[in-house]
Amino acid sequence: MTKSFLFLISLSFIIFINCQENYEMLNLKNFEWKNRVLIIGGDSSKFKSQLDQINLESNEFTDRDLVIILIEKDNSRISYDGLKTIKSIDYDSTLNLRNKYNFKEFKLILIGKDGYEKYNSKKLVSINVIYELIDGMPMRKQEIKERN
């Protein structure tokens, strides 16, 4: 084998590894008992409007251990800090989420720390409604009690 061939193989491997690091493999089970998950998906103007609202009012997401997953047509992203930083999710995880929750049109789903769906809406939802839903959960009440 020539040196240039070995160089190309090495370079291809490095590029492959770097590309893999930009995507996060996602399994919702990994969030159980650690985080609440807000999944927003669909391909519509409602999707953008919901994100705009979250961007304005997401400062309390980390206090509520809330992770946001954004599902779009062929691309999904995740944020652990109220959309301040966003990481892409791998394609297989995107397909799994789209199929599991049937994201053909706009939808917002809230999943509790126990892994169960707590709220599901096809309409825009005020972030304060999400906060109220979370704050009414027994586990959240216990968290608030322990912090005080």
Segments from the language model and where they lie:
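Non-catalytic interaction/Regulatory regions outside core domains
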Residues: 2-5, 16-148
